[in-house]
Amino acid sequence: MAKEGKRIRAAREGIEATKLYALDEAIKLVKERATAKFDETVEVSMNLGVDPRHADQMVRGVCNLPNGSGRTVRVAVFARGAKADDARAAGADIVGAEDLLEIVQGGKIEFDRCIATPDMMPLVGRLGKVLGPRGLMPNPKVGTVTMDVKGAVAGAKGGSVEFRVEKAGIVHAGVGKVSFDADKLVENIKAFADAVAKAKPAGAKGTYVQRIAVTSTMGPGVKVEPNTVLTA
C-alpha cells in the first residue's frame, strides 16, 4: 500500500489541484502519468447542473466517437429471422430470442451492449430486473431498440458510447486509450461533450456544464477548462 501511495503522489506532482487546464494540456498530463503495465482507458467526467431525480432533468444519449473507444465491445441482439441474420452479418457476438432470454435469466451475461428489434421488447421486458441495473436494457432513446440492427451493431463495435447522468449529476465515459494520439483523444472528448451538451434537458436551470475532468484508469484526475472542450 505504501508503494501504491508513493506512486499516486508521484503522479500528482506537477498537477495543480485548483487549476483548470486547456484540454490539450490536460491530455498531455494524463498520458505522461499513465504508468500502468496495461493500456489504460482515458475517461472524461462532466458535472452537470441537473437533478436527475426529476424526470425533466434526466440526461442520456449516445455518442459516436470519431476515433473509436479502443475497447472490444461484446454485443447481444434480440431478433428473429432476417434481422437476426443482419445482426450476425454485422458482427454481433450473441443473437437469439427465447433462447437468449433463457441464457440471460440463467445469469450468463457475457456482453457489454444489448440491442433489440421493437417486436422483441415484450420478451426483453421480462429481463428488466437483470439488465436494468447493469445499464444494458435496450432503449429507443439511445438507438438500441431499432429495426436497423446492422447499423446499431456496427456503431457499438465501432466506438459508440452510451451515457446516462448519475444521481450526483455526473456523466462519464471511456473515450479512448492512453496509446491513442493526443489529437485523437481531444477529438473524442469534444465529440462526447458535444453529445452531452445536445442532450441538455428542458428542466435544466443555470449553468449546465459545471466541471469537466479527465483521467486514466490508474492516474490522477486533471481539471479542464470547459471552454476548451465545448465547441458550441
UniProtKB/Swiss-Prot annotation:
The keyword Methyltransferase does not apply. It comes from the Bacteria. The keyword tRNA-binding applies. Pfam families: Ribosomal_L1 (PF00687). CDD domains: Ribosomal_L1. GO terms for cellular component: cytosolic large ribosomal subunit. One of its GO terms (molecular function) is tRNA binding. One of its GO terms (biological process) is regulation of translation. InterPro entries: Ribosom_uL1_bac-type (IPR005878), Ribosomal_uL1 (IPR002143), Ribosomal_uL1-like (IPR023674), Ribosomal_uL1/biogenesis (IPR028364), Ribosomal_uL1_3-a/b-sand (IPR016095), Ribosomal_uL1_CS (IPR023673). Keywords: Repressor, Ribonucleoprotein, Ribosomal protein, RNA-binding, rRNA-binding, Translation regulation, tRNA-binding. Belongs to the universal ribosomal protein uL1 family. Part of the 50S ribosomal subunit. Binds directly to 23S rRNA. The L1 stalk is quite mobile in the ribosome, and is involved in E site tRNA release. PANTHER family: 54S RIBOSOMAL PROTEIN L1, MITOCHONDRIAL, LARGE RIBOSOMAL SUBUNIT PROTEIN UL1M. This is Large ribosomal subunit protein uL1. The gene is rplA.
